[in-house]
Amino acid sequence: MELEPQYQALRQMHGEDMTLIREKLYEFFSGWLGGPQLFVEKYGHPQLRARHIPFAVNVQVRNEWIACFAQAMSELDIDKALAEPVLIQVFAMADWCRNQNEDGIEPPIPPMAVDPWVRAPELQQILSSYGVNSFFKEFTS
């Protein structure tokens, strides 16, 4: 995010020092992926949507975040059999964090309200628009 100009809107939300952001992200994903509940132990329930209210999270920021996340997974050569299920769930969470009304854009859907895989073609298009083409190739037209 810090090195890629295409993630500028996302980067600007985070301030100069990324140390605490990195730490919280690590702690959150530690628990979310089945490891120690580091985030919960320090901060309580994640309540992701509520924690993101202070930030203007729109479709562009959501797209930059998921593309940046997917790019990192691609650069780390994470196997698609692991990466794709994680990405589709993370995309659903990222969409749920949107808090800006935008003309012509449907409001966010709670992550558990619909099978997230129905949105895989949409996610593939988003990733492709950022040059991240390692995942969801079966949805490429």
Each model region followed by its residue ranges:
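Core of compact, soluble alpha-helical bundle domains
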Residues: 1-141
